[in-house]
């Protein structure tokens, strides 16, 4: 990972040296990430996530075709393979951060087509809470407690982004991007917290279970508008 960030840092420095021949694209659009994650625990099903949100990106390229790209996504995550909440479909939060470099194969006045190798980090968080649930403990008054549970999934991925931009004016344009990634692996944390009254004070008991995540894929189509300068 250190080598990857070193390469990208050097790439950005080189882009500054070629500033006169450098074109930048900044934009935002609607994105629909879909992923499948394997859980390294007996009896646990794979986790399929379908997300809906927004993505912002920067893509810059030199006249010689060298290209760098970075993007950030934030989205609403949905999954029927997570049973944290008392619903058929659980709803959570998803974020993705990716950086990479590659080559722009088409660089005409209006049309730009680039392929970049990308490395990214995904975070998904699902939460649930309830008041006055049954909690049998010797110090719990009335055997009732407030319940909070958080499931966090962190995965690493690498793959390629296929980016196309069409300029509709001097600086304004539309774009589409398809991210195709392999999930290297990751880890999950399932944390449950019970907060209760002992009659003298308020206490909390926290139980956390960790598991490894692995494999499968992430596909993320995006389309929107961009500014070229």
Q: What is the predicted function of each stretch?
A:
Residues 7-11, 59, 165, 177:
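Generic detector of N-terminal low-structure segments
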Residues 46-51, 89-93, 145-153, 206-216:
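Glycine-rich, flexible loop segments associated with nucleotide phosphate handling
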Residues 19-81, 214, 218-220, 224-229:
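Short glycine/proline- and aromatic-enriched beta-strand/turn motifs that initiate or cap beta-hairpins
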Residues 1-23:
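Cleavable N-terminal export/targeting peptides
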Residues 159-229:
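Predominantly the C-terminal beta-signal and adjacent terminal strand-loop region
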Residues 32, 57-144, 149-158, 166-172, ...:
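Gram-negative (and chloroplast) outer-membrane scaffold detector with strong preference
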């Amino acid at each position: 990972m250190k080598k990857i960030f070193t390469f990208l840092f050097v790439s950005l420095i080189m882009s500054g040296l070629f500033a006169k021949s450098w074109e930048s694209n900044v934009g935002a659009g609607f994105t629909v990430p879909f992923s499948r994650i394997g859980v390294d625990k007996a009896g646990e099903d794979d986790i399929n996530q379908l997300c809906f949100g927004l993505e912002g990106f920067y893509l810059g390229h030199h006249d010689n075709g060298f290209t760098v790209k970075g993007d950030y996504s934030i989205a609403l995550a949905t999954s029927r393979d997570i049973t944290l909440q008392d619903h058929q479909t659980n709803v959570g939060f998803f974020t993705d951060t990716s950086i990479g470099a590659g080559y722009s194969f088409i660089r005409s006045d209006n049309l730009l087509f680039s392929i970049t190798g990308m490395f990214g980090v995904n975070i998904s968080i699902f939460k649930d809470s309830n008041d006055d649930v049954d909690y049998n403990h010797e110090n719990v008054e009335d055997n009732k407690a407030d319940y909070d549970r958080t499931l966090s999934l962190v995965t690493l991925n690498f793959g390629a982004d296929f980016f196309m931009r069409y300029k509709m004016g001097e600086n304004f344009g539309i774009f589409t991007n398809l991210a195709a990634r392999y999930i290297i692996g990751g880890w999950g944390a399932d944390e449950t917290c019970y907060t209760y009254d002992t009659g003298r004070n308020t206490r909390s008991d926290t139980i956390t279970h960790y598991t490894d995540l692995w494999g499968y894929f992430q596909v993320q189509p995006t389309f929107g508008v961009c500014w070229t300068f």
